[in-house]
Structure formats: C-alpha cells, structure tokens
A protein has these predicted regions:
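Short, charged, amphipathic alpha-helical segments
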Residues: 1-8, 32, 64, 90-98
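Short amphipathic alpha-helical interaction/hinge segments
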Residues: 14, 18, 42, 46, ...
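Heptad-repeat amphipathic alpha-helical coiled-coil interaction surface used
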Residues: 7, 14, 67-70, 74-77, ...
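Conserved alpha-helical segments that form or flank metal/cofactor-binding pockets of metalloenzymes
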Residues: 1-41
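Acidic/histidine-rich alpha-helical segments that form the ligand environment
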Residues: 39-88
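Inter-helical turn/loop segments and adjacent helix faces that build the functional surface
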Residues: 1, 24-25, 79-94, 114-117
C-alpha cells in the first residue's frame, strides 16, 4: 500500500512536470520515453540471483532506481524554484520538492525492509 501511494504521487508529479514544460515552452522529446522503456527492459536482464523470475534482490533494485529518480526530481523542483520562480508562480515548486523528500523517506524505509529480506 505504501509503495502504491508513492507511485500515485510520482504519476501526479509527471503530469505536473508536463504542465511545467508547457508553461516554459519546452517540448517533450520523442526519444526519451523510448529510451526509458528500453532501459527498463535492459534492467530486467540484470542478474538477481535467479535465472528466471523475481527475487528479493529485484525489489531492492527497483527501490534503488525509484530513489534515484525521485532524488533527481527533487533537485529539478529546487532548481526550477531558484531559476524560474516568476515564470512558474502557478506551481508550488517548494511543496513539490518537499513531497519528493517525503517520497524519498518512504522509499528509504521500504528499501531497508527489502534489504533485510534480500540479504
């Protein structure tokens, strides 16, 4: 349930990012979504101690990747807050950064539990 909540927030943040990009007149790359799908598929090839199927290490890897993504998102919100605050006054960039901090804290707790199970 906690992971589902974080994932729902991440999806909401993606939609906000699209709106921010529109506000700034930044086009969305056609290649980046394709690259993300490719990276996700390649990530499945990563050795997790099992030839087939899902292992506890798989969950650990997934949580680590989520943490990396959320940390990057938090840095983006902070950077936009300091560089485009006037252009993006309709967005609460500080609150978005704080939400990312909360997401990181939740993911860290989940990561610790997954590590205990995996190691």
């Amino acid at each position: 349930p906690a992971l589902a909540g974080v994932c729902a927030e991440i999806e909401a943040d993606r939609e906000t990012l699209k709106a921010v990009m529109d506000q700034l007149g930044v086009g969305q790359s056609k290649l980046k979504p394709l690259a993300a799908v490719l990276a996700e598929r390649l990530g499945r090839l990563k050795l997790n101690g099992r030839l087939w199927g899902y292992s506890p290490l798989s969950r650990l890897d997934e949580l680590e990747l989520l943490q990396i993504g959320v940390a990057g998102k938090r840095r983006l919100w902070r950077a936009l807050e300091h560089t485009h605050a006037d252009d993006l006054s309709s967005f609460d960039l500080g609150a978005l950064a704080e939400r990312a901090t909360g997401q990181l804290m939740g993911l860290e707790a989940m990561h610790l539990k997954a590590a205990i199970l995996a190691l």
